[in-house]
Amino acid sequence: MIKDKVIIITGASSGIGEAAAKLLASKGAKVVLGARRTDKLEQIVDEIQKNGGEAIYQELDVTKQSENDAIVNLAREKFGRVDVIFLNAGLMPSSPVSALKTDEWHRMVDVNIKGVLNGVAAVLPVFIAQKSGHVIATSSVAGLKPYPNGAVYGGTKWFVRDFMEVLRMESAMEKTNIRTATIYPAAINTELLGTITDKGAAASMKETYDTYGISPDRIASVVAFAIDQPDDTTISEFTVGPANQPW
């Protein structure tokens, strides 16, 4: 059941995170939203509250362990527990390796990999103490197969896939009742394209998204479906994308 669950969402200021926040709040969840753009978070929380939902927010840079710890503490102080964390923050500045956009490589590692690690490190002690919890992470179809221009981005998303699967296995072995779900979106209309600075990669991705892109609401509904399963059931992976996109 989703109702009354306390759910932390990172990368919540737009796209998939925003859509998930609104949907889960409409189903009775208490959502705790984190992102760097607090003006956007304030607008989303205000809309949720006006519609009768419960939501709070805090500025969050997922690359900083202290800020991940702080949002978990906020959720516990306000609502008394944490039931789910949805690790959704991410960047996609795709480019060919030969472009040597090394600053972007390191930024993707910091956000897409370390952001997931920091979020899990912040919440895992709480979940272990509770003997319950649910970790959901956004990977990508680029975490399932290689694509030109996606060597580093795809590598970060392959990491998420492997890390989440091992977390699932270890949690089962340790009998902590911690569920996991990893989501592999294809062309979903979000602000990710805005992070691409390479002109060739940007043009190619824009054409793909203009042709196939679908609403982030589709991913939000999958997140809700995963959370809504009985506590003894894990659905560990979802690949979701446009019906006509040959990803």
Task: Give the label of every model feature segment.
Residues 13-14:
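Conserved glycine-rich cofactor-binding loop
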Residues 96-97, 104-107:
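Substrate-binding pocket helix/loop in short-chain dehydrogenase/reductase
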Residues 27-44:
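Conserved glycine-rich Rossmann-like NAD(P)H-binding loop of the short-chain dehydrogenase/reductase
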Residues 38-39, 59-70, 102:
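The beta1-alpha1 cofactor-binding region of Rossmann-like NAD(H)/NADP(H)-dependent oxidoreductases
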Residues 178-183, 202-247:
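C-terminal helical subdomain
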